[in-house]
């Protein structure tokens, strides 16, 4: 049974939206699950109005489908969807790393080093949720170092799609071991102001992830969908 816990700092409709979104992104509410307003309002102890508004927002995000007769349900995310995301990430993340290497402060360098080190330590005690949390934190912090709100908004949506895919498919912990080394290389290039290398390392990181997803598609026998 799903456990919903709403924090009180934000408007109720925003809290409902964020809670449902989190559960979809982390796979707690699985693909194809129907989202019943009555059921959700009872579980979350709220009226149907914020539930309805949240479902509409999630549909705008592409996380929920709304169809006549069938109603609202959680959208699928396929290997092809993820490869499409990586096509975007290939250009964006290289630029992000390049810009971060030019703008990062001394304090931010220390924090980025800390996050990369925490990730490296986390993979020694495989905990999927913790590893994914630190992976997301690493990439988000590099964006923060760019001090560019427009760029932050652009990449936020792309990273959210990646987050959902991680929870659904990333069960091979050997993949995370190689990712840790890539994070260290990116971090060092950014911290040392090696702009071209920062971009190259970030590009290589995304290409490695894209290859991992492509090979995963082969294993799942969905290769026709990704070519």
Label every model-predicted segment.
Residues 1-102, 144, 150, 210, ...:
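Short linear motifs at protein or domain termini
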Residues 9, 113-120, 125, 160, ...:
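C-terminal all-alpha effector/ligand-binding and dimerization domain
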Residues 18, 76-121, 129-143, 156, ...:
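Amphipathic alpha-helical segments that line or abut small-molecule/effector binding pockets
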Residues 32-33, 67, 131-132, 151-155, ...:
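Short, hydrophobic secondary-structure boundary micro-motifs
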Residues 56-66, 126-130, 134, 201:
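An N-terminal domain-start capping segment
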Residues 78-79, 165-169:
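Short alpha-helical transmembrane interface motifs in multi-pass membrane proteins
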Residues 81, 108, 127-131, 147, ...:
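Residue-level recognition of alpha-helical structural elements
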